Amino acid sequence: MNLPRAERLRSTPQRSLRDSDGEDGKIDVLGEEEDEDEVEDEEEAASQQFLEQSLQPGLQVARWGGVALPREHIEGGGGPSDPSEFGTKFRAPPRSAAASEDARQPAKPPYSYIALITMAILQNPHKRLTLSGICAFISGRFPYYRRKFPAWQNSIRHNLSLNDCFVKIPREPGHPGKGNYWSLDPASQDMFDNGSFLRRRKRFKRHQLTPGAHLPHPFPLPAAHAALHNPHPGPLLGAPAPPQPVPGAYPNTAPGRRPYALLHPHPLRYLLLSAPVYAGAPKKAEGAALATPAPFPCCSPHLVLSLGRRARVWRRHREADASLSALRVLCKGSGERVQGLRRVCPRPRGATATCSSDHQACCIPRPLPLCCKCPPPPLLGQFCSNSSSIRRRTAPTAALPPRARCWAGTCRPRRPC
């Protein structure tokens, strides 16, 4: 292609010039060899381009990352011409966008499930809630749990069942609904440190309930013994008794409803249940229900308390003669039986003798028949003196059996009270 130029350069004659000395000198053409090298490089590049175009017409090699791309993609026929533009489609989103998405999600509250349940119960006016009510409060108060509602409901249920600080209260009769109520144990009010729900002092453990401990009842109990909250309750069992009780001693029951007998763990009750029933006492008709215990005709609150103390002493020292003699009531052959009460005569070891017709069984001072013709014990003397006329009007003398068992050496001769 450039051959005529090369031949022209070679065929140019050498010009002669004179030196300062007058001698002829030769001038070489500078850059002749360099021009030849450049011509050869251009020829090689042109031949290589010609070969590539002849083999792949319509294609042009674009070296980007060692990959040959079609001409139309390089010139802008559907693909990015700039490598920086090519990578923008597959580039990861910036960190600011991910941070903004995390910021929009609500954070988890720093409270435990026990603290959340306690908040829900305390905000209720009645201080009790069902499981659904507790979950509704937590969802409405904290948006984090609102978005993840079904996942943590079982955790609330497990915490209610496994922690002693929560007490299950049955639903009141006549109030339709599903599920029981849950409340806080009164002894767990100081469970959190300084009222802060973030710090819990220690795991609450419910202690064993003591006899007579007050439990919160969701609805009023049926007619029961008035001594439920008495420090010295004494259950009295017997058949329905017509005598009128002392005003204020026991609650009045509704007509047509059977009152329940108090089953209270008291030493006096164990004493009554473990003692044999007096065999000679007249039996009431079968099917008679438990009635409201009738008080003593000559009784007072001081007498009931004293009898309870004497019964506990006998319970602890029942084999000691000194304690047994303090608990006995001496009776004679004929007397009066208070209607509605039973005669129970426990007998210590070794007592096998039977008294004569002039004597009657010795009894323990509890709801026992009192005789108007027996010497009252020192404890009952101050109360029985003013009530002999009342006892004569309440029960006939012929109601008592002629014979009874008693302990040997404990009965005294008959004498009027």
Curated annotation (Swiss-Prot):
Organism phylogeny: Eukaryota, Metazoa, Chordata, Craniata, Vertebrata
Protein name: Forkhead box protein D4-like 6
Region (Disordered): 1-50, 70-105
GO biological process assignments: anatomical structure morphogenesis; cell differentiation; regulation of transcription by RNA polymerase II
Key words of the record: DNA-binding, Nucleus, Transcription, Transcription regulation
GO cellular component, one term: chromatin
Entry-linked InterPro entries: Fork_head_dom, FOX_domain-containing, TF_fork_head_CS_1, TF_fork_head_CS_2, WH-like_DNA-bd_sf, WH_DNA-bd_sf
The keyword DNA-binding is annotated on this UniProt entry: yes
CDD domains: FH_FOXD4-like
Gene: FOXD4L6
Basic and acidic residues composition-biased segments: 1-29
Pfam families per the UniProt record, alphabetical: Forkhead
Compartment(s): Nucleus
Record-annotated DNA-binding residue ranges: 108-202
Biased composition (Acidic residues): 30-45
A GO molecular function held by the record: DNA-binding transcription factor activity, RNA polymerase II-specific
SUPFAM superfamilies registered for this protein in UniProt: Winged helix' DNA-binding domain
SMART domains: FH
